[in-house]
Amino acid sequence: MATREQAILSSSMQQPPPLGVPRPLRVVVVDDSPDFLEVICGLLRLEDSIEIVGYGTDGTQAIRVVADLHPDLLLMDVQMPYMSGSAATLIISQHFPTVNVVLMSSDDSLQTRIACKSAGAQALIYKPAFRKQFFEVLEKIYCGAGAQATVDQNESSRTQP
């Protein structure tokens, strides 16, 4: 029987796809609202270029899932019980710097934007505008526009509910 460490190690040593064949973006989704989690995952499953590899409902679970699965992207709510998304982002960005973190919030205050940026998030998506902003954010992150521009631009592209 394999130990937990062996299982984690073997799962992280998967063969890369053949050269020239892009692999799907491996995404972990974390939100304390089961309804919103279901909606977001439903939208993401429509995309062939995205593979949801894990879920969580609070910041502590986000850290554990990222440590176990090493996703390309962590999509996480800001306000959650036990540990906020911004607190989890600070830890994840220090220990797993290759994981891009995109935070989501219904709170579009300056304080929330500053907290997300300070924690190391690549972007903050305003939840009521998720559908519009998500793919714009992905393009900016993975096409090299940079985190600063992504977090700042979302302030001007938010739509009011």
Model-derived features with residue positions:
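Conserved acidic segment of CheY-like receiver
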Residues: 23-36, 40-44
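Receiver (REC) domain active-site loop signature in two-component systems and cognate sites
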Residues: 80
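Active-site beta3 strand of CheY-like receiver
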Residues: 69-75
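Short amphipathic alpha-helix used as the core "switch/output" element in two-component signaling
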Residues: 64, 86-97
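Acidic catalytic/metal-coordinating carboxylates
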Residues: 58-61, 83-87
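Non-catalytic signal-transmission and effector/linker regions of two-component phosphorelay proteins
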Residues: 1-26, 132-161
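Alpha4 helix (beta4-alpha4-beta5 surface) of REC/receiver domains from two-component response regulators
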Residues: 87, 108-125, 132-136, 140
